[in-house]
């Protein structure tokens, strides 16, 4: 978890494989989704948008540095909220090595969903799927509460990206979860 995130939160348990934890049953299809979260949200919502908070330099933890193959302990973080019919649904942040920004086209991404780029024409490569539970503080996008999230490594061409997705309370308004 990066303390520099716009939405204040604290991880309650270490990242674990799906077999090591017990998230709410209704969230399992979301947490274990193999395809793009953007596609899943678009399938279940008439309205979808991306709110970009920005890109910034951040200190990478040792495991993050290893997963994104960063030569230095600093990396870049792209932070967004994905909105659906009932408001903010997913808080996302992606960590990557600075070299990836220069050579992968991430700089020009803007408010285009990262999932559209990664899951474009070719099958995406994903590994290191892990889940964790977070305490999220009250903020302009959601009330305080406990939320579940996932992180996994995806590849944009040759560049590894560590993608984090936290499922916000308004996602439970989605008809699939009822």
Swiss-Prot record:
Binding site for substrate: 37, 78, 114, 165
EC number assigned by the record: 4.1.3.40
Pathway annotation: Cofactor biosynthesis; ubiquinone biosynthesis
GO molecular function, one term: chorismate lyase activity
GO BP annotation list: pyruvate biosynthetic process; ubiquinone biosynthetic process
Gene Ontology CC terms, in alphabetical order: cytosol
Localization annotation: Cytoplasm
Enzyme class of the recorded protein, top EC level: lyase
InterPro entries: Chorismate--pyruvate_lyase, Chorismate_lyase_/UTRA_dom_sf
Catalytic activity: chorismate = 4-hydroxybenzoate + pyruvate
Keyword Cytoplasm set for record: yes
Chief localisation class: cytoplasm
UniProt keywords, alphabetically: Cytoplasm, Lyase, Pyruvate, Ubiquinone biosynthesis
General function of this protein: Removes the pyruvyl group from chorismate, with concomitant aromatization of the ring, to provide 4-hydroxybenzoate (4HB) for the ubiquinone pathway.
UniProt record similarity statement: Belongs to the UbiC family.
Name listed for the protein in its UniProt record: Probable chorismate pyruvate-lyase
